[in-house]
Design a protein with these regions (language model features):
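Low-complexity, compositionally biased segments
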Residues: 9, 16, 33, 50, ...
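Gram-positive cell-envelope targeting signals
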Residues: 1-12, 168
Length: 192
């Protein structure tokens, strides 16, 4: 008979954990910055956002509110409702429109976030995402699996010293309105 710990170990998917950990290692999980930093929004939603061009040639990112809710719940230990998740975006650069995104003559400019209620799309100006960062994730064989959690260290890429420890937890969150719940969520980011 399998022990509870063995069952949980079997439930882990390190490939899924790896996708999330690489994003969190770079951005952290301070969601309060979303209302002022569209580059953070672009980073968090990079796997879900669709790229299009505005009439003036500016690259726009579009994400459904359902996918956005899943991402917010993935990056936080708190369980967000749709309204709570959307309120994270509401700052001086946030605008809501009653129409579909495709029907609006208005499109966001740099640092603006537009929410189109007609088809529940969040649209913002894309930022170029790079692969050059001063931090890196510790090798997989050093990850610590503890029950339904995985503790992973983030290192300074040059000195290899530990910058932070991120704890990912199997996602057992219960919320309405998402599209596809992530395998893990970020339980904590502890900086050294």
């Amino acid at each position: 008979k399998k022990s509870e710990q063995d069952k949980q170990k079997a439930a882990h998917d390190l490939k899924e954990a790896e996708k999330l950990i690489h994003k969190v290692a770079i951005s952290g999980n301070d969601l309060s910055r979303l209302k002022t930093q569209t580059n953070l929004l672009a980073w968090l939603t990079q796997d879900k956002a669709k790229k299009t061009k505005a009439p003036n040639g500016v690259e726009l990112f579009t994400v459904s509110k359902e996918d956005y809710l899943d991402v917010i719940n993935e990056f936080s230990d708190k369980t967000y409702t749709m309204n709570e998740a959307l309120s994270l975006l509401k700052g001086p650069n946030f605008n809501e429109y009653e129409v579909d995104a495709e029907k609006s003559p208005l499109y966001p400019t740099e640092n603006e976030i537009h929410y189109y209620k007609g088809n529940d799309k969040i649209v913002f100006v894309g930022m170029p995402l790079t692969n050059k960062y001063p931090q890196e994730v510790e090798a997989k064989d050093k990850w610590k699996v503890e029950g339904d959690s995985i503790k992973i260290n983030v290192l300074d890429a040059m000195t290899k010293t530990n910058i932070s420890t991120i704890t990912l937890k199997l996602n057992n969150k219960d919320y309405q309105g998402g599209n596809q719940k992530s395998k893990y969520y970020v339980e904590s980011v502890k900086y050294n």
